[in-house]
Amino acid sequence: MGKLTILFLVAAALLSTQVMVQGDGAHERTEAEEPQHHGAKRQDGTGGYPVDDVDMMQRIFRTPLKRQWCQPGYAYNPVLGICTITLSRIEHPGNYDYRRGRQ
């Protein structure tokens, strides 16, 4: 137990000195050094999103592969990444046109 406690104290002391050394050499960022936040408003005052971001978002939302077309009675669950059964499929198994009635 004594060796483990000493080892823990030495590790804590090393970590604290490392943090102090990093803190001494730090300086404040200027506006040029600050990272550009993705999706932030334009800096030129016109508002809206940059053209590249709009183009990227349109590509994502219009691509059929991103929507993952599933067979009738199933819907794509983006969290699971698979097609999952819908409630209407459970209520009306084997008849996905139940709303139209029998024709």
UniProtKB/Swiss-Prot annotation:
One of its GO terms (cellular component) is extracellular region. Disulfide bonds join 70-83. Keywords: Cleavage on pair of basic residues, Disulfide bond, Pyrrolidone carboxylic acid, Secreted, Signal. Residues 1-23 form the signal peptide. Pyrrolidone carboxylic acid at position 1 has no significant effect on the structure of contryphan-Vc1. Its main location: secreted. Residues 24-67, 99-103 form a propeptide. Unknown. Intracranial injection of the peptide into mice does not produce toxic effects. In addition, the peptide does not produce any observable changes to normal or depolarization-induced intracellular calcium levels in mouse dorsal root ganglion cells. Adopts the 'single disulfide-directed beta hairpin' (SDH) fold. Belongs to the O2 superfamily. This is O2 contryphan Vc1. The lineage of its organism: Eukaryota, Metazoa, Spiralia, Lophotrochozoa, Mollusca.
